[in-house]
Amino acid sequence: MKNQFENNWTSGNNGYPLFNEEVEKYISVLPSENQVRLAENPFYCFIHFGMNTATAREWGTGTETPSDFTIESIRPEQWVKSIKAAGASGIILTCKHHDGFCLWESEYTDFSVKNSVFNGDIVKMVSDACKDINLYFGVYLSPWDMHEETYGTEAYNDYFCNQLTELLTNYGEINEVWFDGAKGANAKAFEYDWQRYYALIRSLQPSANIAICGPDIRWVGNEGGKTRKSEFSVVPKALCMAETVSKNSQHSEKDAVKLKTLTSMDEDLGSRKVLANSEELCWYPAEVDVSIRRGWFYSKNENKTVKSGRKLFKLYLSSVGKNCTFLLNVPPTNQGVIHHKDVHALQSLGKKISRITAAPILIENPGQLTDKDGWVDFDFGSSRKLKYIVLKEDIRKSQRVEKFDVYIKKANGKYIRAASETIIGSCRIIALKGKKCIGARLVVRQSRGNPIIPEIGFYE
């Protein structure tokens, strides 16, 4: 009888080289320390709040006036407590959306909270509230500005950098800067000076990751929470430009030609086939951004569209549990609080996340699997109801595993395959719904070099 584990990564590596010059190139691509820290804190929340909250719109027009911002008070302490209850580690605030209205008292425009009925600096209030309960704070600053008169001229790059400097110097440590690639069809053709923006961030906030239209975190490609079967972090370097030259962002014909065969929405971004055709590679992990409601800004008409804790948990498993980060948008109301339905959903999500690792059966460190290892066995000591398996690669040594199986061992000694997956990356969560077993076996079928797995945990 054929051994069911015979086709392991040591005997053929699924038909791919385990080591060669190309493989060495792939596994030489490593994350920065900022990106490692991101992987260790993969769940955080978006706060869409601003002029659109007051006017009940998703996108403003840029023709609003400060008097249209009729919100007089907010409760940021309620925001951060609700978000921390969900298990999130930080917040990113929309400091300026496309309409151009600023939630801080900027020196460079009158279109801000300083000329509204609101008495205070919202960015400071939220950043202070984050510090009070140990959440990190990030900023969203829309490059597209429908209000600013200099938009479309070189002077706008100066304006944007001035505002970026205000945000990066007045509110303590900034963990992430989120650049949106959205741009209206009728907006002026204009190329943002991205390299200048990046250099400014690296200078003023060297620990900050730059997301989406930036070199550190890529957009997963949709806003519905859908992830690929294989979300690779090692991808062609050209993908780092994909959002900055997209049809909704910049309109540089020369750059667009370079990217005509590669976008954030492509299904395959990091397989060996794709990487083999790419001269330069980079570490560029995916971020899954999705709203707890139908829209991104609060609308009372969407109170019935709040996603349940169960739905949010599925999104968590398919993002954090598949080598991505999870950015969940939670929009406060025009009364300055997070709606009670959203709060309930966040609390439910937090409880479900905490249950993943609440009851450990066994946590092991297989370490580096050598070419003499066919598989790794795990003995539970007695019959247990296995609900979750959590695997982690040492991403400081790159992303290596391309295909693996997990088998569970029944009381009669037989092995049953419980999961057949592709990548692991920074975190892979496998849900098994309480399968009874006395042990388990990990078989790596395909890898780029020797797999390095510092942690695999089994939980009931």
Residue ranges and their predicted role:
Residues 439-441:
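Short, conserved beta-strand segments of beta-strand-rich sandwich/propeller modules, principally
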Residues 435-437:
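Extracellular Ig-like/FN3 beta-sandwich strand-entry sites
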Residues 2-411, 415-433, 443-459:
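Mature catalytic domains of secreted/periplasmic carbohydrate-active enzymes
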